[in-house]
């Protein structure tokens, strides 16, 4: 695939919003599964990486909103915080992928993920302290809420998202980010086979 069209990106964004509804429902049986695994984060981050910043932002805002309206999760009082947090994840991951060109896909993916995760958590934490929590939000509460309690989810996202992205690219469902690198790899593989 040479390039994703606006229609392609819109369809993928809608799919990721749907996953924001479905994935949390699958974790209902696990106590505090939503907190531990942060299931909405995965499709939003993936949407930002694949479709770009505007679509990632839309996915991050609509995901919690649609999920809350359809399933009651997140609860209505917490929904605005999640909309900001996830919107930032989608926006930042898309921006980093747009402007960072290291020459290596894995480096770009992990840089985008880490910067988006940190940026989203820091900005949302500041907003919670200044606006949503009225000055009663502490550093320890921020660290516990955004890093400690959701550590399994962070690890899963850092493992799965690059794997999914690379798999989609290799299946020709996404444009190849570095065609020259892929061509070189194919050439070396061909040479190896010819020498057998």
Language model features with spans:
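Conserved small/polar residues in nucleotide/adenosyl-binding loops
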Residues: 185-192
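Short helix-perturbing small/polar motifs within transmembrane alpha-helices
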Residues: 2, 11-22, 59, 81-129, ...
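Short, highly charged, low-complexity non-transmembrane loops/tails of multi-pass membrane proteins
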Residues: 175-184
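Hydrophobic transmembrane alpha-helices
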Residues: 2-50, 54-55
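Membrane-helix interfacial "entry" motifs
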Residues: 1, 5, 9, 74-78, ...
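Alpha-helical transmembrane segments of multi-pass membrane proteins
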Residues: 41, 45, 83-90, 154, ...
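Interfacial aromatic-anchored transmembrane helix boundaries in multi-pass membrane proteins
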Residues: 22-38, 62-96, 132-133, 141
């Amino acid at each position: 695939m040479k390039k994703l069209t606006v229609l392609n990106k819109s369809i993928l964004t809608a799919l990721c919003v749907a996953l924001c509804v479905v994935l949390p429902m699958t974790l209902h049986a696990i106590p505090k599964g939503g907190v531990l695994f942060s299931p909405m984060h995965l499709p939003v981050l993936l949407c930002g990486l694949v479709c770009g910043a505007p679509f990632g932002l839309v996915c991050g805002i609509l995901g919690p909103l649609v999920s809350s309206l359809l399933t009651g999760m997140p609860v209505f009082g917490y929904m605005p915080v999640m909309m900001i947090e996830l919107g930032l994840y989608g926006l930042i991951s898309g921006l980093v992928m747009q402007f960072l060109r290291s020459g290596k896909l894995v480096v770009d993916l992990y840089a985008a993920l880490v910067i988006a995760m940190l940026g989203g958590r820091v900005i949302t934490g500041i907003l919670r302290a200044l606006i949503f929590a009225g000055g009663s939000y502490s550093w320890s509460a921020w660290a516990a809420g955004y890093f400690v309690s959701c550590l399994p989810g962070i690890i899963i996202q850092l493992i799965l998202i690059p794997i999914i992205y690379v798999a989609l690219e290799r299946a020709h469902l996404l444009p190849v980010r570095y065609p020259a690198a892929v061509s070189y790899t194919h050439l070396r593989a061909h040479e190896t086979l010819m020498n057998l």
